[in-house]
Amino acid sequence: FGVPKEIIASIIGIESSYGSIKGSTRVIDSLTTLSFDYPRRSKFFKIQLENFLLLSREENFNPLELNGSYAGAMGYGQFLPDSYRRLAIDFDEDGVRDIINNPVDAIGSVANYLKRNGWQKDADIAVEASLVDKQNPISTIWKMKKNEHLELKPKNQIEFNDLKSE
């Protein structure tokens, strides 16, 4: 996949504290509540609920036993059900895609997720930036679009044309 192991480890560390905190809420309860009691996000979570039920059937999970986050994310990488169905892989080739209990499948699935969402091997993953025409330059990672009002200027050209979103 071309994704550095440090990036995958960082994501799994942030999302589930390396698998030690994968969520304690029943996924079916989270998704049902968010689907029907929160109109602003109802459409999104109804899609997740449908995907969760399909995933449970496809992977032979008991939908009443799976725990995850309050938003219905599951496993080491905290995949939502639609991402689990599309992007989870059987990285250890044991015949099962298990990103909830199997760290090997989770590692491969995080790499697959990044690759399928535009990861480019050997591309810059952070860009040093400084404030334009300001006295105190900043060297940190910024989301460029969100912070346009700060007049941030990357020190190197950034190419966005190859990135994609699903």
Regions of interest found by a model, annotated:
Residues F1-S165:
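Catalytic glycan-binding domains that act on GlcNAc-containing polysaccharides
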